Amino acid sequence: MFAYVGTQGHMLECELRPGKQHCQSGTTAFIARSVETLQTLGLGGKCLLRLDSGNAAADNFDAFGDHYFIVKRNPRRECPEQMLALARRVGDKQDSREGKNVYTGFFDHFHPGSDQNRPCVPVAFEVIERTIDIDGQKLLVPKLEVNTWWTNLSCRAKTVLDLYHGHGPSEQYHSELKSDLDVERLPSGRLCANKIILLCTMVAFNLLRGLGQEVIKRAGLAPQKINIPRWRIKTVLKNIVYCAVQLVRHAGRIELHFGKRCRWFEVIQDIAHSFA
């Protein structure tokens, strides 16, 4: 299980679990630990926590503290037709193509985990009614799609949807961890050893992520145009870490000698001076 912070993809917490462990087992403690780690960063103000539907258990809400949250909620007992009728009555209709009606808004009568002892939490909804498919074929029976999210944000429902969809790059961060750092399969047959390896991987992941951000800050010194907010880990490895150098020990000093044709020398030198 992984928690990422910020828009550049730094890893906040990680936890390796046995395959037989239920996804909710230990999740509340993991969220509480992530929130505690987040507070030690001293960012100031409240943070927004975004979680998938697998983490929508009622116990997890106790770990959010005073922070804002958006948690994907899977409709279970609700009838889509009733949800559509309710959305038409209390929701806002969004602009869309012909044959597609999109309603967004809030429901205020749901309890987390259907536990009546818990206070109601607002639920942002998106109800989509399709009478014509994307190819222009009219449907005999309208196709309904209902999406809901637990949230304590006071903004418009459309903004809640956009904020939740903004956590999509987390899947890419996970892909970088597995492919770019080659940790899709952990080497040891012991869980405790693999946990240590994963923690070391998190340190390397964040160091490379930070190095990539330092390079982007020096885009003016780079030999190629950089107009993106974040570098993939493999790009950092290819352009910076894998630069060929000669390690020289002389007069009690350790020096790195770069070749005359090293394209990234000015960037690397400026980064090194900034941390000297």
Specify the residue positions occupied by each region the protein language model found:
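Electropositive, glycine- and tryptophan-enriched low-complexity nucleic-acid-binding patches
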Residues: M1-G42
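Short, conserved catalytic/metal-binding motifs centered on acidic residues
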Residues: G9, K46-A56, F69, W149, ...
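Active-site beta-loop-alpha junctions enriched in small/polar residues
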Residues: R17-G19, G54-A56, N74-R76
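Contiguous mid-protein beta-loop-alpha structural module that forms a pocket-lining wall or clamp
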Residues: N55-A56, D66, M83-L84
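A short alpha/beta connector and helix-capping loop motif
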Residues: A58-N74
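An anionic, glycine-rich sequence signature occurring as long contiguous blocks
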Residues: I70-S179, D270-A276
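Short amphipathic alpha-helical "interface-anchor" segments enriched in bulky aromatics
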Residues: L153, A157-I196, C200, A204-Q213
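A short, flexible helix-boundary coil/loop motif
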Residues: L208-A276
